[in-house]
Swiss-Prot record:
F-type ATPases have 2 components, CF(1) - the catalytic core - and CF(0) - the membrane proton channel. CF(1) has five subunits: alpha(3), beta(3), gamma(1), delta(1), epsilon(1). CF(0) has four main subunits: a(1), b(1), b'(1) and c(9-12). Produces ATP from ADP in the presence of a proton gradient across the membrane. The catalytic sites are hosted primarily by the beta subunits. GO terms for molecular function: ATP binding; ATP hydrolysis activity; proton-transporting ATP synthase activity, rotational mechanism. Keywords: ATP synthesis, ATP-binding, CF(1), Hydrogen ion transport, Ion transport, Membrane, Nucleotide-binding, Plastid, Translocase, Transport. One of its GO terms (cellular component) is chloroplast thylakoid membrane. Belongs to the ATPase alpha/beta chains family. It comes from Cuscuta japonica. This is ATP synthase subunit beta, plastid. CDD domains: ATP-synt_F1_beta_C, ATP-synt_F1_beta_N, F1-ATPase_beta_CD. ATP binds at G170, G171, A172, G173, V174, G175, K176, T177. It holds the Pfam family ATP-synt_VA_C.
Length: 490
């Protein structure tokens, strides 16, 4: 069990001192390599295939099994096209090692920590291996505290835990990317923190779109790259399963350095955690393991736990993780999402219905949940106000069928008042984002939690019943809503 923070530094020894073996079998992305007796590499060591004669291959593999007879089985992190039996393989003597620290900000990396954005080499003076122990119990910060994001609907109805794990659910086109970018922007401005984005097994186009939008919104500063607020690590769905299985660990290793050495608060995004499980399932089958339920790997819980347990708060800093969760065939009992749910502290569900109404962020206030929304953690006032808001919205939801058939006039006076307040609440949950300024022309707003609670209390108390509901749409705090109402009257 590791007690002291890890040491970071140049961890690769010179090539001359390394063990050399040769390929004896290739089955797709899996290689069997023979080494001299007594020179066997350790499990998880990185092996590099150098090619023959003048042919430079540079295919990196990771040792997964020791087979006996001085052979190991390794999984490739790159394409294995062009590899042949008999090619020389070098044991690096260490697991995959990636650059960490400030030089990673504003750059895009692959699973091996190599920059893939054509902006030249990255400073590799400070590096770290991707396989590490979770922090020891005595290092953990066990105090429950809210991680304020400045986004009203999140902080008020489904608050994030500092050092916690949040599941992000939502289909295409409901504002997932914009929400992620706003969180990256707000953690940098309000907490002096940084973010790491791990693209695990998703579309290359989506990764490119995210990068372009980040440049447009200023999250990545092209002119002064060190001013950027995020490092990007991609292992997209066209890559071998080994790369997709390990890219989450590469992103996490970069985040751990910011937490342990720079003592910062870090946001780690993983998109998509299901693809991490899927890649592990592919690798497991390639290695000949007996599949478990629904064809998943027998080590599913162990693999998920080894990733998730490293995401936590320590006395130095915190890693708060937001993980997009794909639910195959909408089956929440599928082993992949079911194993993920066991680790989550909160869920943020994006609703297509709210997005269609133009309410952004389109976070569903009734479906999103958080274990932090308890009176002993958030306080009585916050808890009571949140419950009243949810009750009002739930009643509005129940009345919508009656309104659609009979109209508002058929409702009782009390129900009409509930509907009016619920519509104001729904609009007040929307908010202009800093990263969307370039598209909307409206300046972004960061709203503190105390301001948010005050605003909802005023709506629930009936003090603002006379204001039109459009005054509450896309504003920051409640004072802006009253000001907007005055402007609408004039």
């Amino acid at each position: 069990m590791r007690i002291n923070p890890p040491t970071y530094g140049s961890e690769i020894s010179s090539i001359e001192k390394k063990n050399r073996g040769c390929i004896v079998q290739i089955i797709g992305p899996v290689l069997d390599v023979a080494f001299p007796p007594g020179k066997m590499p350790n499990i998880y060591n990185a092996l590099v295939v150098k090619g023959r004669d003048t042919e430079q291959m540079n295919v990196t593999c990771e040792v997964q099994q020791l087979l006996g007879n001085n052979r190991v089985r390794a999984v490739a992190m790159n394409d294995t096209d062009g590899l042949m039996r008999g090619m020389e393989v070098i044991d690096t003597g260490t697991p995959i090692t990636v650059p960490v620290g400030g030089s990673t900000l504003g750059r895009i990396f692959n699973v091996l920590g190599e920059p893939v954005d054509n902006f030249g080499p990255v400073d590799t003076n400070t590096t770290s291996t991707i396989h590490r122990s979770a922090p020891a119990f005595i290092q953990l910060d066990t105090k429950l505290s809210i991680f304020e994001t400045g986004i009203k609907v999140v902080d008020f109805l489904a608050p994030y835990r500092r050092g916690g794990k949040i599941g992000l659910f939502g289909g295409a086109g409901v504002g997932k990317t914009v929400l992620i970018m706003e969180l990256i922007n707000n953690i940098a401005k309000a907490h002096g923190g940084v973010s790491v984005f791990g693209g695990v097994g998703e579309r290359t186009r989506e990764g490119n779109d995210l990068y372009m939008e980040m440049k447009e919104s200023g999250v990545i500063n092209e002119n002064n790259i060190t001013e950027s607020k995020v490092a990007l690590v991609y292992g997209q769905m066209n890559e071998p399963p080994g790369a997709r299985m390990r890219v989450g660990l590469t992103a996490l290793t970069m985040a751990e350095y910011f937490r342990d050495v720079n003592e910062q608060d870090v946001l780690l995004f993983i998109d998509n955690i299901f693809r991490f499980v899927q890649a592990g399932s592919e690798v497991s089958a390639l290695l000949g393991r007996m599949p478990s339920a629904v064809g998943y790997q027998p080590t599913l819980s162990t693999e998920m736990g080894s990733l998730q347990e490293r995401i936590t708060s320590t006395k130095e800093g915190s890693i708060t993780s937001i993980q997009a969760v794909y639910v195959p065939a909408d089956d929440l009992t599928d082993p992949a999402p079911a194993t993920t749910f066991a680790h989550l502290d909160a869920t943020t569900v994006l609703s297509r219905g709210l997005a269609a109404k133009g309410i952004y962020p389109a976070v569903d206030p009734l479906d999103s949940t958080s274990m932090m929304l308890q009176p002993r953690i958030v306080g009585e006032e916050h808890y009571e106000t949140a419950q009243k808001v949810k009750q009002t919205l739930q009643r509005y939801k129940e009345l919508q069928d009656i309104i659609a058939i009979l109209g508002l006039d058929e409702l009782s006076e009390e129900d009409r008042l509930t509907v009016a307040r619920a519509r104001k609440i729904e609009r007040f949950l929307s908010q202009p984002f800093f990263v969307a300024e370039v598209f909307t022309g409206s300046p972004g707003k960061y709203v503190g939690l105390a301001e948010t609670i005050r605003g909802f209390n005023l709506i629930l108390s009936g003090e603002l019943d006379s204001l039109p509901e459009q005054a509450f749409y896309l504003v920051g705090n409640i004072d802006e809503a009253t000001e907007k109402a005055m402007n609408l009257k004039t």
